[in-house]
Amino acid sequence: DPADIGCTYEAIIRVNSQSGKAGSAWLLETEHSVRLPRGMEVEFSQIIQKKADQTGLEMTSDVIWDVYEEVYLNLNSPFELVSFDSQKAGADQETIHAVLLHKGKTVSISETGNGPISALVNAIRAHFDVQFKLADFGQNTRSSTSRAEAAAYVELTDGKTNQSVYGAGIDTSITLAPVRALISALNRLS
């Protein structure tokens, strides 16, 4: 136990090119309150290990967060979310209205589904030449303060290659976080 020698687990966790999959995911969860699903944990650890191989350095929590933001959160091409609204359209239906920038062009889309993610998936399939399957999505709360944020994760399967890609989104809205995650995954798919 690290406490036996006056340390904490955080002080002895090292992520480098020889690290296993859990190190970077553990640091994201403990330092940034982001819990990755298993498949995304594997994908992200490979990205971190490649970065560690390229630099020859240990990956600190801050570097791991910067890579996470770069790979999942700050993607704005070819899709960028401009606005999003969701309204009940019956007992089990919601209608979304979204404005996206797609390859520099503003596109307004509307569609109905059994929830906001389903409706947005339907709208994107109807308006863009993108073939994918929504394989999984989920979210967790990043803090319990009055400024709580949701961290969401989406897994898409490419309709052409059958490869999985993950996207992530963070927002104070529990509706917008998975919407942002879907856009992130679409941008990684493209």
Where do the PLM segments sit?
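A mid-to-C-terminal "edge-of-domain" accessory segment
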Residues: 1-110, 144-149
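Short alpha-helix boundary/capping segments
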Residues: 16, 108-115, 166-177
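Glycine-rich phosphate/pyrophosphate-binding loops
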Residues: 31, 35, 39, 129-137, ...
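Small-residue-enriched alpha-helical segments and adjacent helix-cap loops
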Residues: 89, 95, 103-128, 132-143
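Terminal-proximal interaction/regulatory segments of ATP-powered molecular machines
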Residues: 112-116, 124, 154-164, 179-181
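Generic long, charged, amphipathic alpha-helical segments
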Residues: 130-163, 168
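Mixed-charge, glycine-accented linear interaction segment located at domain edges/termini
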Residues: 161-166, 170-190
